[in-house]
C-alpha cells in the first residue's frame, strides 16, 4: 500500500483544492457529503444492498457503511463521521485504520439521528451532497446538491488523479483474472450460471461488490445488450459466448467485454475483424480528439465489416447514412469510467454544466467530451443480430442487407469487445490488454 499512500496524499490535496475553489465561487462554507443510508424493501424487514454515494467514495474507500459523513471546506483537515453502532444483530465495521485515515479527523457516530451533534452549528452556508434530501431538510440544510457544485464536481470527475488511475489499473488486473477463468469455463462446457460463479470466485467479489450486474450470454442471448438472466441449463449447441463483466478496487470500476466462438468459423473471423477495428480506434485516441468523432469513425469501420462479411451491400458511407450500421451497432462506442461504470461528466463541456448532447443520429452515445490527459474511457464496438432493430429499417435500407447471411449469424447473437483506456498526453494506456486479456 506504500504506493497508494503516496498517491493518495496528492489525491486528497486535489479534492481539497476543488472543494475550496467551488465553495469560494459559490460563497459556501463547505460540503457535507453523506455516504447514504439503508433502503428497506417494501413490506419486509430486509434492506436492499447498500450502494454508497459516489461523491462520498471519491474521498475514501468506505463502500459498505451507511450513515457516514465527510465534512470538508478545502482548508481544514476533513472530518469523517464514521457510523459504528452498538448492534448485536449485525457485524459492526471496525474503526478504519488504513493508509488514508491520517488525512481525516475521525469521529464515531453510534446513532444516525445524533449526526447533528457532529455537524457545523450553522448550516446556512454549508451544502448537503447526497441522496437523502429528507434528511437534509430535517438537519436544516438550505443548499442541497446545488447545481453549480454538482456540475463542477461532475466535470472534474473526468480528470483522474494518479491515485484514481492506480486504483483503476488494479480493478482491471482483478477483472482480467475473472475473464480468463470465464473463458476457460465456456470452453469446458459450463452454463451461464456456472460461468458467473467461476468468474466471481476468481476475482473474490460477490454479486453486490462488482460494479454492475455481469452479462454472461451464450449463443443468441448475446444479442440482448443488457442480458442478465443467467440460464442454469446448458445449451444443446454451444456456439458463442459474450461476457461483459467488471471488478472494483477501492470503489473504482473496471468494465470489460469479450466475445468468443466455440469453433473456428466465420463468426470467429468476424470477432477477429472487430477486434482489429477496436484497436484501430484506440490508436486514434489522444488529447484534443472528439469522442463523437471516434464513435462516427467506428460506424464507418463497421459498415465496411458488414460489406466484407456479406451482411450488407453498398458502401460504408451508404450504410451509415441509411442507418444500417446503427441497426447492427446500436449503442455508443463507450463512456467515461471511474467511481461509476458510466461515470458522471460525459456530456459536460465545462465546469458550469454546459451540456453537449449526443448527435441526433446516435442518441445512445454516453460521452461527447473532447479527450484530455488523465481521462479513462471504455472503447466497446459491437455488432449484433437484433431482429427488432433490423425490422425497423426503411425499405431502402432493408434492400441493402443480405438476409441469408444474417440468418446464418443470428444463432451466434452478437459481438462486443471492450477495453479500459487511459488517455495520456503522449500515448494511450490500454489497461485491459496490458494485464493480459489480449483476445
Swiss-Prot record:
One of its GO terms (molecular function) is metalloexopeptidase activity. Keywords: Dipeptidase, Hydrolase, Manganese, Metal-binding, Metalloprotease, Protease. Its EC number is 3.4.13.9. PROSITE patterns: PROLINE_PEPTIDASE. CDD domains: Prolidase. It is an enzyme of class 3 (hydrolase). One of its GO terms (cellular component) is cytosol. One of its GO terms (biological process) is proteolysis. InterPro entries: Creatin/AminoP/Spt16_N, Creatinase/aminopeptidase-like, PepQ_N, Pept_M24, Peptidase_M24B_aminopep-P_CS, X-Pro_dipept-like, X_Pro_dipept. Its cofactor is Mn(2+). Mn(2+) 1 binds at residues 255, 335, 380, 418. Pfam families: PepQ_N, Peptidase_M24. Mn(2+) 2 binds at residues 244, 255, 418. Splits dipeptides with a prolyl residue in the C-terminal position. Belongs to the peptidase M24B family. Bacterial-type prolidase subfamily. This is Xaa-Pro dipeptidase. It comes from Shewanella frigidimarina (strain NCIMB 400). The gene is pepQ.
